[in-house]
């Protein structure tokens, strides 16, 4: 095999070499990627699941997406929790402090049991694909909802919902209402029934597609108590799909090629399959079987002009899938990983002037000329960082002809954690002190920015195969596909695990940034800027619905001093108010001056809501059992959790309406203490204190006029 010399991307101490490097369009491409300052965000949660009324504590780790260093430009992050319909349940905007980003999301005790999506991002990350935001599916249980159990089964035309009490006895002859909605929230029908002798409610499904994202909203009257629940319909159990990925992306005629495959169910989970590859005559060419999480490989020697299809089976289910076509004039990379190096070879027709380019997270680490007569070589990896190495075979115009992902692991070079408590045993409510030590593989102390979660191991069970900060930064955040049980691939350096990790590399593509042409980076025009400080932004729209160009906008905080700013909108009516440094919740009053009609309130932009996905509920049920035990006695006193009731009455003290849409009484004003006299006056109707002046609403038209203030 021919061994190629790896070319350094940045020759040290060579001015002439540095100038030539800057002129290389390949390096200019990756320099352009790094200049966009991409970011990654990971949230360390105190628990993997929660009960209604819990507090979700977390610490966020924000890093540069290329170097994984924490010296990012953003000083604010956004965290929100949404249900499966996309409705935001709780949200926080968090400012960086001396310890980074740490905060919490209190969960309402009335939160229905179900699965929710936790999402975190920065304002700058909105300029990139939402697929690379931090996302995690969170299961939330509710001890009140647990008093009535629901179980759903499906027929070809119905969803059968059975109700039972906490002891499993069916709830018979109870009045129930349900509404059926499609995935877009459109109401399909509403029906009232009485439950059957088995406690069943029968919901007609008008068409198969309703099960893809549709849901049922139910209300059950049991003993004078209204029980409500929303159930999301599950996709057809027999639905699964199989994808095929030739190594290097192409089937080369006459060259044996390793073909990887991945089988997934409709809910995104892997499916174990087996099958056969058939040619155009229906003859079996090769058989295959999944070896790990629906993934596997087989060897295929394709023929020019031949077409191949696969017959795939999962249990009693069977589907047919088509393999990629045999490319005419195709070329494809083949790699083999060995300690400290990667062997590569390009099969097929290699264009003259081709180069092999390698990068890790956008940092170019090698550029190797590829000779079409001897298109093979070696890449040394000892000095490369851990993570996904993306190899691209680019022709003389910069167009990638073949790609391959390889994961680089630092075998046997793991840090060691040691936690030492000050006592072997502790009494009830006794303070626990523990020392935490982090050492490198050589036993030397290592400094770290860390967070620690302490939970009851009888109530909370962690999934050792799930996502953590290492798997997220090195693996999951750089590929767009779903990785099932990512922690499995990092438990040890077993060759079997490394082979299965390579299956993940072969069945997922690099998608953090586009590589259609390495000589011409796609233009990057950010729509959102980096949040170094806090700001308010929006758009001024006139009453006729048109934008209000060059309108003057000002805002002043009603419960903070020296928190105000003014700006002028641009030609499209958009504005930004900056320099607003505050914490906690702040109430702003805005003033808008413009020519023409009185404007509507400024519009503010919200990012798209996240989608939801799969979850596991058994651990949540065990956790709720522990919660019930905790509710039984608190400080030795027995506590009873009462059933929920509905109160159908009107509060006589609540004002029906006001001229200004809000009432500030002494109870509300006491929340803003301490408060200056000037800001106190701002709560008076028609009054506004801004820029050390008192303004009163003008009766002659919209806007404010300056008033004289005398205080005796």
Residue ranges of model-derived segments:
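Bacterial Sec-dependent N-terminal signal peptides
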Residues: 1-24
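Surface-exposed, low-complexity/disordered segments
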Residues: 32-36, 47, 51, 72, ...
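Glycine-centered loop-to-beta-strand initiation motif
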Residues: 60, 90-107, 161, 193-205, ...
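Short glycine/proline/serine/threonine-rich loop/turn segments at secondary-structure transition edges
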Residues: 68-70, 109-117, 209-215, 385-390, ...
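Short coil-to-beta strand junction motifs in C2/discoidin
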Residues: 71-77, 173-175, 704
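Solvent-exposed serine/threonine-rich low-complexity stretches and specific carbohydrate-binding patches
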Residues: 76-78, 88-98, 188-198, 284-294, ...
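Short amphipathic beta-strand segments in non-cytosolic proteins
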Residues: 77-91, 177-192, 274-288, 358-365, ...
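Periplasmic plug
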Residues: 696-712
């Amino acid at each position: 095999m021919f061994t190629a010399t790896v070319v350094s991307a940045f020759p040290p101490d060579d001015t002439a070499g540095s100038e030539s490097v800057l002129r290389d369009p390949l390096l200019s491409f990756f320099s352009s990627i790094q200049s966009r300052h991409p970011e990654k965000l990971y949230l360390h949660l105190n628990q993997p699941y929660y009960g209604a009324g819990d507090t979700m504590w977390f610490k966020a780790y924000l890093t540069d997406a290329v170097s994984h260093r924490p010296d990012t430009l953003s000083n604010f992050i956004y965290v929100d929790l949404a249900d499966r319909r996309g409705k935001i349940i709780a949200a926080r905007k968090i400012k960086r402090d001396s310890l980074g980003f740490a905060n919490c999301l209190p969960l309402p005790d009335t939160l229905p049991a179900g699965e929710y999506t936790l999402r975190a991002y920065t304002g700058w990350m909105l300029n990139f694909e939402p697929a690379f935001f931090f996302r995690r599916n969170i299961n939330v249980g509710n001890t009140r909802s647990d008093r009535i159990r629901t179980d759903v089964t499906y027929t070809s035309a119905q969803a059968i919902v059975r109700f039972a009490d906490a002891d499993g006895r069916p709830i018979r002859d109870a009045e129930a209402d349900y509404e059926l909605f499609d995935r877009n929230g459109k109401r399909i029908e509403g029906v009232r029934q009485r439950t059957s002798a088995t406690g069943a409610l029968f919901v007609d499904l008008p068409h198969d597609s309703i099960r893809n994202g549709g849901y049922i909203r139910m209300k059950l009257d049991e003993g004078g108590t209204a029980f409500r629940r929303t159930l999301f319909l599950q996709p057809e159990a027999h639905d699964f799909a199989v994808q095929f990925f030739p190594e290097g992306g192409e089937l080369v005629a006459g060259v044996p090629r390793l073909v990887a495959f991945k089988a997934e169910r409709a809910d995104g989970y892997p499916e174990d399959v087996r099958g056969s590859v058939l040619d155009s005559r229906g003859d079996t060419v090769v058989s295959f079987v999944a070896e790990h999480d629906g993934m596997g490989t087989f060897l295929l020697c394709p023929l020019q002009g031949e077409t191949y299809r696969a017959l795939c089976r999962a249990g009693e289910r069977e589907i047919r899938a088509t393999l990629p076509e045999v490319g005419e004039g195709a070329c494809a990379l083949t790699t083999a990983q060995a300690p400290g190096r990667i062997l590569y070879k390009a099969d097929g027709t290699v264009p003259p002037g081709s180069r092999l380019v390698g990068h890790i997270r956008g940092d170019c680490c090698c550029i190797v000329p590829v000779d079409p007569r001897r298109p093979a070589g070696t890449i040394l990896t000892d000095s490369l960082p851990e993570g996904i190495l993306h190899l691209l075979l680019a022709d003389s115009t910069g167009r990638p002809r073949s790609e391959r992902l390889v994961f680089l692991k630092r075998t046997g070079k793991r840090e060691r954690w040691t936690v030492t408590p000050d006592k072997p045993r502790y009494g009830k409510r006794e303070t626990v002190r523990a020392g935490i030590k982090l050492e490198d593989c050589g036993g030397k102390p290592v400094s770290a920015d860390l967070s620690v979660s302490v939970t009851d191991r009888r109530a909370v069970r962690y999934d050792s195969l799930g996502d953590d900060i290492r798997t997220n930064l090195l693996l999951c955040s750089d590929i767009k596909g779903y990785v099932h049980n990512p922690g499995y691939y990092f438990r040890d350096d077993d060759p079997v695990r490394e082979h299965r990790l390579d299956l993940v590399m072969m069945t997922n593509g690099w998608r953090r940034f586009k590589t259609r042409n390495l000589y011409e980076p796609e233009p990057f025009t950010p729509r959102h800027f980096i949040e170094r400080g806090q700001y308010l932004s929006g758009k001024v729209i006139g009453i006729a619905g048109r934008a209000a160009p060059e309108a003057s906008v000002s805002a002043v905080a009603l419960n903070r001093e020296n928190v105000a700013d003014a700006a002028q909108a641009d030609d499209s009516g958009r504005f930004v108010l900056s320099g607003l440094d505050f914490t906690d919740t702040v109430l702003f009053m805005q003033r808008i001056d413009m020519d023409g009609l009185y404007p509507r309130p400024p519009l503010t932009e919200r990012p798209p809501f996240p989608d939801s996905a799969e979850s596991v509920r058994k651990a949540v049920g065990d956790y709720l059992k522990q919660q019930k035990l905790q509710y039984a006695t608190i400080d030795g006193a027995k506590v009873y959790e009462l059933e929920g009731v509905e109160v159908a009455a009107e509060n006589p003290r609540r004002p029906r309406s006001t001229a200004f849409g809000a009432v500030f009484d002494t109870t509300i004003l006491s929340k803003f203490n301490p408060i200056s006299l000037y800001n106190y006056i701002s709560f008076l109707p028609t009054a506004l204190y801004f820029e050390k002046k008192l303004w009163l609403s003008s009766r002659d038209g919209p806007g404010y006029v300056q008033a004289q203030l005398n205080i005796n």
